[in-house]
Amino acid sequence: MENDQDQQQQQQQSQQQQPQQEEQEQVDVDLSSLQGQERIEYINTLIADSYNIAIAKKLEEFLDIQINENTYLFQANSTLLKLYQFNPTHLNKDSIAKMLAKALMNFPCNDFLFLSYMIPSIIQKEEPLLKLFILNNFLETCKFKEAWTHINSHSFFSEIPSFIDNIRNFISGVLSITYQNISITMLGELLNLSDRTQLVDYIQSKQPTWKISDSTVSLQSDNSKQKKADTFTFDQLSRILPTFIK
């Protein structure tokens, strides 16, 4: 009888330990050994258990991979931030800054706004997060010259691969729907390309939509100009112009 009870207890203990062992094995996976879709599938398996703080370190590691390899998985980053939200003692401001930077690189998607809802306002005012919220405000209000001044004054931004390129591409998109033609001087200022050769190379990379004519750059194709002339409203114009008129 006692032997039967001992066996039952051992079976119960084994059943209890098995999920813990499986969980530990899951978070012990070396991310560097996974590539491409295999890595994404593994991360998706982790975030399915989105309230388990044990996965936070692995998601932080994956965030660093996103930074270094210029990839992006918003769901993984938002899951990590949610874990910080429910486990404030594990909060890592450096990791939050990195995920906010990746969200800015994905403008004009509202990823940054979504993440900001999960960050206490008092922490938003602390570095290294404050510089990101300031930049977000400049970009949202189309204060592009101020945005570049801010970016150039903080090495944090230049240390993130492709960050400046992504921000420049976002600004280019805004300019393309705002201006039909713009002076090459103003375009250089708004894109933070003071070197004429670099600016011309950038404009040429946008061809055939962008075209240089003397000191002016056309930012829209003839077809785009006609379509926008047919659909542009005064209400749209009244919202955009104040951000450029100083």
Curated annotation (Swiss-Prot):
Domain PCI: 72-235
Keyword Cytoplasm: yes
Keywords tagged on the record: Cytoplasm, Initiation factor, Protein biosynthesis
A GO CC term assigned to this protein in UniProt: eukaryotic 48S preinitiation complex
Subcellular location: Cytoplasm
Low complexity bias locations: 1-21
Record InterPro entries: ARM-type_fold, CSN8_PSD8_EIF3K, eIF3k, PCI_dom, Transl_init_fac_sub12_N_euk, WH-like_DNA-bd_sf, WH_DNA-bd_sf
Disulphide bond pairs: none
Subunit structure: Component of the eukaryotic translation initiation factor 3 (eIF-3) complex.
HAMAP family: eIF3k
Physiological role: Component of the eukaryotic translation initiation factor 3 (eIF-3) complex, which is involved in protein synthesis of a specialized repertoire of mRNAs and, together with other initiation factors, stimulates binding of mRNA and methionyl-tRNAi to the 40S ribosome. The eIF-3 complex specifically targets and initiates translation of a subset of mRNAs involved in cell proliferation.
Family statement: Belongs to the eIF-3 subunit K family.
Official protein name in the record: Eukaryotic translation initiation factor 3 subunit K
Provenance organism: Dictyostelium discoideum
